Amino acid sequence: MARFVVAGASEYLAITGWGIDDVKLAKKAWVFAGQKCLKFDATPVSYDIDVQAMSSEKLPFRLPAAYTIGPSPKIKRNPVVDGPAPPADTQRRLEDCDEEALLLYAKLIAASQIRSPNHVIDLVKGVIEGETRVLASSMTMEEIFQGTKKFKQQVFDQVQLALNELGLYIYSANVKQLVDDPDSPGNDYFSFLGQKRQAEVEGKAKVAEAEARMKGEIGAKEREGLTLQNAAKVDAETKVLSARQQGVGCREEIKVKADVEVYENEREADIAAARAALAVKKAGLDKQSKVAEVEAVKAVVVREAELQLEVERKNALRLTEKLKAEKLSKATVQYETQVQDSNAALYDRQMAADATLFEQVKSAEARKAQAGAKFFEQKLAEDARLYARQREAEALAGVGRAKAELVASMLQELGGDHGALRDSLMIDGGVYEEVARVNASAMSGIQPKISIRSRAGGANAGASSAGAVQQVAAADVYDMLPPFLQSSGGFNKLPL
């Protein structure tokens, strides 16, 4: 009895039995009688492990870690991330290793994991704790603490080597900070080490503070000395500068007095000019104010006149509108009456014009239809004549082609003799008969001159022999030629 088994996305099939030497791994397969199929999950599992180890000085410590471990599947390379693919033999070896890892997992762990889920956890914990303890026992606590990163990497490498024997692969490893073992009383190495570091930091801070305070006091004393030196120097320079400034002050005082007198004179002149300009400006302003007053009075008078004119205009406009309304109502009624009469007359004329136009349109359409029919008949007749001429031309063309073929065949039969071909065509065409007919019609009614000559005697003729008779006939023909030629020359107008 066969059945088809399919594994899930994260599952594999381990098939053993008939026809299989060892173990066959597949994602889907037919399972026949005599075979056994085991479906195992290849999903990685996270393990939180708290390893208790001891250094070479016999100091216990704890190493908390979190590992994500699972069976090693076939790894497909990504050219973008992993770079160019390795050679074919190397790639084959890698794939073989992955296949071997899955086979190891299927043989050693998969079945026991299904029966006892904690079996893999205990196995992994045992491997990690064993490798960590072996590595820690060969190092001092100081080496472990100072090289924590290196120690973690070595633990990871050693654990991975051990797990390779079981077909397991570490997907990720997060090793936490080293801590003291709480189960070992009196073991406070990392706490003491922290206190030591804290004390060292505090000592360095105090030394730095003392150095800063010392530098501050020295700087303050240096500042005080520099201040006294600078004060004495400034006093001496001040006395020299004071004497110099007194002499300069006297000179400047005399110069200032002269400048003050000049300035006062200039100011008096400026004041006089300003007063004169002020008087002129006051006179101009008085004039402008008086002119403005006069203009204001005149403007009031003009505005009163304009307002009075506007009032009179409004009154006249009101009277005009009143008269216009009275007269306009009568004119509007009369206008509307006349408009209605005109519209009625216009409507009658439009109806008559529409009727006339309709008759003309219908008459034009009838004439157009007659003209179209006549044109259609003419077109049909022309088409018939054109078709007859086309058929006649086609017949003539066919006759011409037939004649050409006949002439070509006759010329071929006559051996290329064009003279014989011409005579044959003239005979077939009745050219000679036509020439004889034309000559006969031309000679009808003509009275030719005929002369008959004979050489035969009465008695002697009967007694002549047959040969003599023939000679006499030939002589008669020769005697007749001159008159015949003369007659023909007179008829044909040809010189002979």
UniProtKB/Swiss-Prot annotation:
It is found in: Cell membrane; Membrane, Caveola. InterPro entries: Band_7, Band_7/SPFH_dom_sf, Flotillin_fam. It is a lipid-anchor. It comes from the Eukaryota. Gene3D superfamilies: Band 7 domain (3.30.479.30). GO terms for cellular component: caveola; plasma membrane; plasma membrane raft. Keywords: Cell membrane, Coiled coil, Lipoprotein, Membrane, Palmitate. Pfam families: Band_7 (PF01145). The keyword Coiled coil applies. Residues 301-328 form a coiled coil. A lipid is attached at C37 (S-palmitoyl cysteine). PANTHER family: FLOTILLIN-LIKE PROTEIN 2, FLOTILLIN-RELATED. Belongs to the band 7/mec-2 family. Flotillin subfamily. May act as a scaffolding protein within caveolar membranes, functionally participating in formation of caveolae or caveolae-like vesicles. This is Flotillin-like protein 3. The gene is FLOT3.
